[in-house]
């Protein structure tokens, strides 16, 4: 197959340069857990005991269980926590010593050999549930189970932790390099530069004054009256110095020159030299963990990353030596100012290099290549090789027909691309023909496209009256009652099942679940929801929290709410569920966490995280993802779309400008979505064409980019395999997008996908120009999401709205609770607003359909979210509470 640049090039499977493993393989050929997990009593669906285990696997398990002291779940003498507690706790602080401890933890867990046990026959969901129970459950609860059940939980937990510990270590390495090394060195360098600025200014002024004298006294100057050229004012060097010293004494001039040599970089330097020089002084941060890094993490690389990986593996041999020669390093990696710092530092002896500077040069390259997946970890799930996960060979051939049919994509590109090119050409001509009559489109002197601002949609008196009447009729309730009532309508509480799978359902479990949702969703903790009744006692809350509330059960409950929201006539008036938007909501994380990132604009001096969530045009939240810091939304949009909790598959996707890139445009279009980002920087957007000679009238200058159809066609099979792998869930879109770019530039395959995306991007811009209604539809959907985020802020009011979670799992769980409370409150509002509209119609009120479509389900004046909470649902004989008199006062 031709044109496989970026995927395969004969360097091993999927184009990967293979290296020998540096992690113990464990028992070779470990048998699977029984031929049939269900029949053998294994970890199949609904089973709580392990299946028969092959002898090599059994030996490995018992070594881990007994030899390591984990199986007793007890606290060793003199210790505060059990061995299990110690090993399942990941790093939280970002520092060199923490990095060393994270690698030691990964090494210790890998030594159990559980990574070699074949668990392929165990249902992944069951394995995930057991490992989650083992990671989060209290040791006292785990001790209550039988030996077989504890062994199964231990094995699932250790298998999970084997790769998770490496994930945690590399997460910490990434944030350590980015924030504590590179960013801190840049900040300190900038401070030093600012501090030295007055000296530089004074020295520069003296030099400028002196050289002005030189020019004035030595340059030829024409007499404008006579045209003659008089002789220079000075005829000797002594005379010139005499003239200079009249304005700047010689000793001050010498001091100014010395100051500039001290405070400014050499001419052949670059802008990075100052902070890189400061970075070298922080070698003590990386010294403790460098040797562990290359021995614990089983690194591998693509051909492009092989040189960096080789340099990384050589670093332990250089550390601590007094003299390292140029032949012992890879000089090709010394880009920019690194060459001077490594090879020509003032303190170096002839024939030696600065190996500390070289170490940081390699780490800077490693950081970049880890993020682009050109260097990866074979014993990690998050930092592994996405190319190895792509559908290939027989697996791709089997999936290919189904993928192409599902996405409506052809196996051959020529006809499809010709049709797309014809559509683009025709749209250009149609819109260009309407430009003279359009007041919406404006071109500046450079031919750049501008839109006239959308006028605010007027709110007629009928809408204001309807909104006031409906809002006045909504019953006044406390948030716990909302949750209990929604549970009674939907049965969403039934989605919360015990992770042990064998536990009898607790009495009044719905009350406990509602209390926990308030505790987490309102960010207030247990204290305000605790009570004397059994469902609200601390022990019950803690037990249910650990065994019933987890990401999988939040998602299952949310799917039920989404389904019920779609069935309400009022929600159907708002939309058909086929338009969705994706946007981020920011949370300050004030506690130390590897999974928080700094951003002064959003988080001040703290770290933070972003909840990237999706909402459809029926106001239902379809799911979301918690990511560290404030990364570009475009990296995660596809993953959020494919990992939704429930509801119809959206067809049109609205995002803000931060979610836009040509590659993302291409991937979303290939995946069957109509991508509609808001383009705040529209005049700077390049429009694209296929036919360079076509005359597109007013768009002639704006359409200055050319789409290369031949490039797309050359890579078509790989493009199909990429989107097929994303569509089937074989690989995360985030990893693919990272893989398709290197150093900010697309790979050949990424460039082909970007060219495909430029067709859709240009069609989107043309539609924005031609259809004000399309622009308004995008704006309405974006405003809908902003309204949801505003309501979320009101709900998540405790602890100043800050997220006190150290680990990503905890963040996802708490934000999962917030998302579920949001959807429950929106469902409550929608159903009662629908009833209010029906009542108003029955009473003869002037209710217009266009006004009903503009009602918002994010009203909150009638919901009490503060104080201590009551979890007793009143009798509702009619199924719903009585609507309030629309003329009643607003007192709750």
Swiss-Prot record:
Residues 1-12 have a biased composition (Basic and acidic residues). Residues 1-63 are annotated as: Disordered. InterPro entries: Tn3-like_transpos, Tn3_Tnp_DDE_dom. One of its GO terms (molecular function) is DNA binding. GO terms for biological process: DNA transposition. Residues 23-34 have a biased composition (Low complexity). Keywords: DNA recombination, DNA-binding, Transposable element, Transposition. It holds the Pfam family DDE_Tnp_Tn3. Belongs to the transposase 7 family. Required for transposition of transposon Tn4556. This is Transposase for transposon Tn4556.
